[in-house]
């Protein structure tokens, strides 16, 4: 699996993730880019789960964003509907964390589109470690969103065997 973390704080939203791809208990690749900019760099997204499945979903999500002119929530809901109802797509195993300048969402293969109350998203095998760390840093420091994502991913990578220290981090300026 992996660790993907998104933090929205003050005027920024940041999504970061590690680069490890595993097959069973073997590391197959250490520099997979699991974080992407989509729709004219107005949306950032990360995935946890099967790499090929996630790339398929990224492509589909980018098409939905284009179809709905960058409306993140609408594109996410339409992707989730397709993902849930299409027999072939239902077999894809991945989670997406997506964000634009206003909204952060988790999209699942069950057809769920979840907007977290606190604009903090953590998915993947190291997600709970990264989320715990991020919560503590948000509540007890004055670090910015980028620093919180970096430090939290580092902590997750030190604990989770399916997460490495090869991070990709993207950010957008936020309206919140």
Curated annotation (Swiss-Prot):
Known regulation of activity: Allosterically activated by HslU binding.
This protein's UniProt keywords: Allosteric enzyme, Cytoplasm, Hydrolase, Metal-binding, Protease, Sodium, Threonine protease
Compartmental location: Cytoplasm
GO cellular component: HslUV protease complex; proteasome core complex
Binding site for Na(+): 157, 160, 163
Active site: 2
Coiled-coil annotated residue ranges, if any: none
Primary localisation category: cytoplasm
GO BP of this protein: proteolysis involved in protein catabolic process
Top EC category: hydrolase
Statement: the UniProt record of this protein carries the keyword Cytoplasm: yes
Family membership: Belongs to the peptidase T1B family. HslV subfamily.
NCBIfam families: ATP_dep_HslV, PRK05456.1
The protein, known as: ATP-dependent protease subunit HslV
Organism listed in the record: Buchnera aphidicola subsp. Acyrthosiphon pisum (strain APS) (Acyrthosiphon pisum symbiotic bacterium)
